[in-house]
């Protein structure tokens, strides 16, 4: 027979009393009124805050965006197919944040910073808010270091500095993403962390970019944030902010970062969809009234930090697609007014075989020569002037049949300079190679060659200079100026290579 021992029972009761933790948990709960199209209307949740995360019964997370008198409009971060009318929703008391760490380098993730490349979880000890305020005026300093893209046309005439925001704009299929990926490839060995954000792109296009980066070893210093065209609008809207939060993490660790948004007009479309479904009043082109703020708060996060904060930087390259060259549409004009310049890619130039198809005439960089090394400033000024004069002459020459010798020479020089700006995709040039190429063109060394021979000669000259006269590269990389000694070495190399080239031909 079982005996009941009073002392044992009293010990158990005493232990339980000691372990008793009096905790009152207050949870704000609401009820789903209606759900559909990625939007849920919720009754209750009286104390929910704008932008707060809410959790549905079946695990889906949403963001409270519309706080109305009798209900709350929530956008869903998922398909929400299992959410039922009448089910309960609880407020989490948090706003959207993501884990951040150096382990993200080389990975492909979604807008919630979850890996989507099938290579396992990513460990992270810290987290950052997806939407954090941009650095203030005192926290910044003016842009003064170059961020080399490896493209002659950009680095010589539309230079980009670390901490700048430069828009890449053009019609579809004009090589916008190619300019951005070439810039990532050119950061190899430059100690720059790159973040590529694909918003509403085809999954095949994103896969192609990732493959290119992997083949060239660029994924070692790159993070890809992808929300493809089949993702919910909420996640497409959040993806750029996730990318910015990751880039900021490295920026505040005194590192240089480059972030590419491809493209913010898709983000604006996702935001328009959410806003219209939430019954917010539509404005121009049916976009909501705060679509400017959508992009300005994102792009203002790019900065060159002051010396007190470690001089880290975040350079932003947003890519905007235009419809048949219409730069005056709503989103393009918004982004142009926020950024520090734009690189305009033209379909006509692309079809004429001028690639990268950069229209140098209407592309600008508002940072200008502050973002160039001295050596580049010394050779690039002449190039821009000669190309501008050539463009003017070319338009005039179409109507005039008999041109004097000087005009003919200027046209011939201009055609060779245009040839010199052409580059193959995924073949960025070092700054020393660019300086050598520009000097050769602007000083008339290419004038004696046929237009078709220019590129071949330049490729051979670069190889010849690298193998036979390595001191040229050493002078420019150490002094950052185009010294008389460097000029003498370059002139010798050009003459020697020209003799060899003409013998071959």
UniProtKB/Swiss-Prot annotation:
Major localization class: plastid
The record's listing under InterPro entries reads: ATP_synth_asu-like_sf, ATP_synth_asu_C, ATP_synth_asu_C_sf, ATP_synth_F1_a_nt-bd_dom, ATP_synth_F1_asu, ATPase_a/bsu_AS, ATPase_F1/V1/A1_a/bsu_N, ATPase_F1/V1/A1_a/bsu_N_sf
Task: List UniProt keywords, sorted A-Z.
Answer: ATP synthesis, ATP-binding, CF(1), Chloroplast, Hydrogen ion transport, Ion transport, Membrane, Nucleotide-binding, Plastid, Thylakoid, Translocase, Transport
Q: Which GO terms describe its cellular component?
A: chloroplast thylakoid membrane; proton-transporting ATP synthase complex
Give residues annotated as binding ATP: 170-177
The function of this protein is: Produces ATP from ADP in the presence of a proton gradient across the membrane. The alpha chain is a regulatory subunit.
Similarity annotation: Belongs to the ATPase alpha/beta chains family.
What name is this protein filed under? ATP synthase subunit alpha, chloroplastic
| Phylogenetic classification of the source organism | Eukaryota, Viridiplantae, Streptophyta, Embryophyta, Tracheophyta
Q: Which gene encodes it?
A: atpA
């Amino acid at each position: 027979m079982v005996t009941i021992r009073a002392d044992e029972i009293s010990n158990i009761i005493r232990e339980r009393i000691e372990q008793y933790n009096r905790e009152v948990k207050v949870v704000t709960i609401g009820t789903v009124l209606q759900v559909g199209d990625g939007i849920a209307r919720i009754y209750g949740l009286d104390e929910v805050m704008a932008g707060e995360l809410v959790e549905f019964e079946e695990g889906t997370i949403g963001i409270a965006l519309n706080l109305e008198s009798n209900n709350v409009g929530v956008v869903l971060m998922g398909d929400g197919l299992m959410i039922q009318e009448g089910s309960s929703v609880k407020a989490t008391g948090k706003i959207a944040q993501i884990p951040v760490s150096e382990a993200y380098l080389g990975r492909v993730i979604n807008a919630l910073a979850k890996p989507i490349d099938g290579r396992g979880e990513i460990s992270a000890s810290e987290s950052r808010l997806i939407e954090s305020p941009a650095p203030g005026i005192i926290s910044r300093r003016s842009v003064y270091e170059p961020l080399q893209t490896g493209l002659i046309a950009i680095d010589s005439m539309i230079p980009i500095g670390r901490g700048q925001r430069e828009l890449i704009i053009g019609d579809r299929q004009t090589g916008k993403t190619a300019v951005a990926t070439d810039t990532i490839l050119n950061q190899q060995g430059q100690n720059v962390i790159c973040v590529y954000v694909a918003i509403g792109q085809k999954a095949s296009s994103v896969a192609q970019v990732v493959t290119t980066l992997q083949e060239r070893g660029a994924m070692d210093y790159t993070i890809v944030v992808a929300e493809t065209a089949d993702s919910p609008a909420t996640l497409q809207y959040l993806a750029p902010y996730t990318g910015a939060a990751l880039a900021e993490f490295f920026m505040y660790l005194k590192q240089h970062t480059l972030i590419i948004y491809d493209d913010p007009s898709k983000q604006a479309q996702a935001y328009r969809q959410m806003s219209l479904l939430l019954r917010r009043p539509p404005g121009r082109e049916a976009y909501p009234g705060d679509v400017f703020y959508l992009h300005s708060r994102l792009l203002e996060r790019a900065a060159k930090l002051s010396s007190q904060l470690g001089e880290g930087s975040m350079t932003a390259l947003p890519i905007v697609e235009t419809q048949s060259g219409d730069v005056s549409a709503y989103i393009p004009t918004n982004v142009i007014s926020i950024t520090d310049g734009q690189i305009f890619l033209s379909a006509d130039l692309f079809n004429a075989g001028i690639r990268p198809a950069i229209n140098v005439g209407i592309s600008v960089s508002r940072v200008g020569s502050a973002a160039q090394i001295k050596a580049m400033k010394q050779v690039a000024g002449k190039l821009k002037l000669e190309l501008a004069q050539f463009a003017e002459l070319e338009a005039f020459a179409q109507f005039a049949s008999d041109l004097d010798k000087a005009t003919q020479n200027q046209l011939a020089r201009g055609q060779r300079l245009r040839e010199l700006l052409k580059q193959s995709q995924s073949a960025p040039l070092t700054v020393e190679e660019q300086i050598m190429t520009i000097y050769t063109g602007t000083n008339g060394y290419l004038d004696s060659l046929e237009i078709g021979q220019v590129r071949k000669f330049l490729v051979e000259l670069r190889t010849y200079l690298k193998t036979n006269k390595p001191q040229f590269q050493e002078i420019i990389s150490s002094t950052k100026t185009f010294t008389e000694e460097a000029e003498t070495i370059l002139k010798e190399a050009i003459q020697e290579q020209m003799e060899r080239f003409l013998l071959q031909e």
